[in-house]
């Protein structure tokens, strides 16, 4: 099995599940036990500053770095936060995914947001998407998802409303030309 860790899953037009329709999901873990990822293009109705307020974390006023939205990372564990950011060694609970991407789950990164210790770019998600053993592979076989290597430019510098389209452009073909039977000989 080839791991899709540090890849982006792109929902194909055939995927009509309202939770995942037109989503781009960053895969944090993929092995024989299953997969776990974070949806990166569904802003929640919650700003970063509102979340910090709810957690009683003090932050500098009028900081542009904190004006963005929190993202709906997926339907599982919606009270759990994940921060995707460029690698830094400052945090208690981090996993380096590549030379360009790290995922942190500890509160200390939230406490640093808006300060000079904060990562220069970040996506903050609540919840995650999870797949049981073999489930993601089955969905890939059904043409529900396509995968590309993770792209920091797409993660950190592309507006969320454009991430699905930009990701599909990296596939090298028109995703709208896919049929439900592609790959099934």
From Swiss-Prot:
Q: Which Pfam families match?
A: DUF179
InterPro entries the record matches: AlgH-like
State a GO cellular component annotated for this protein. Answer: cytosol
Superkingdom of this protein's organism: Bacteria
SUPFAM superfamilies registered for this protein in UniProt: VC0467-like
Q: Which family does it belong to?
A: Belongs to the UPF0301 (AlgH) family.
What HAMAP family is this protein classified in?
Answer: UPF0301 (MF_00758)
| NCBIfam families, per database record | PRK00228.1-1 (NF001266)
The name of this protein is UPF0301 protein IL2218
Recorded source organism is Idiomarina loihiensis (strain ATCC BAA-735 / DSM 15497 / L2-TR)
